[in-house]
Amino acid sequence: MRDRCVALLAPALENRSDAVVVDATVGLGGHAKALLEKFPNIKLIGIDRDQVALEKSRTTLSDFKSRVTLIHAIYADIPAILAELGIAGVAGILFDLGISSMQIDDSERGFSYSTRAPLDMRMNKTDSVSAATILMNYSKADLARVIREYGEERFANRIAENIVKARAAGKLESTTDLAEIVKASIPAPARRIGGNPAKRTFQAIRIEVNQELEILKRALPKALDVIELHGRIVVMSFQSLEDRIVKQVFAEATKSKSPLGLPIEMAEHRAKFRLVFSGSEQADATELAAKH
């Protein structure tokens, strides 16, 4: 999707000598590098809450140092970051939501259910709340709520009950412990479909640890506030919960505010934004496999 993201942002960045683009999830710097190479006059602000990723992107983007500003922050802070830099608005914003393959591959960070690791899952290692904080302290009801809402897991109550039992017995110390608890909580017929049975619970705990959906809900309206006239916002979402939020915010932003029954649409009621295309586009099989 990298080339497609660059193409979608292109109309806002082409033939501009003063355009600023925000890569709100700069990660390893791949999308940022593609944008900087394609549009030699733009300046880029790269934001990431993951310090490890930010340092790697610094290396990736070292040839563009004079045009790049890297910030350790969450993307809901975009307006404050721009104000600090003296920037009133930007021509483009790119979001690549969810977890990265780099984070999954670093087994010690606890994002993977296939390798024994501490119960961490923090994207920002300086945050105080980890997966262990949640798993060891949340009530059964709160655990079930998180797993059901953020993992869309129909066996959430049973999983939560078994987590509480395991922690009381001192048998919940690692990611593989959690994965085994989840597996034992799901009936055998249900385990045979949908991939690893721990996937949904790990997603749910990770989202709760990092407050991913709450931050996204705050960030998108703020992104709309700082985008310039004829600017573009591109969002890559990976799962249905993110996708739902993005579609809801964009649908509201592109809707006329004209009262029902008014014979004509007044200028002040017109939508301030329009969708570049309706619906969504799908990554190819290779990228989907890498993201998993």
Q: Which residues does each PLM region occupy?
A:
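S-adenosyl-L-methionine-dependent methyltransferase catalytic core, i.e., the SAM/SAH-binding region
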Residues: 1-292
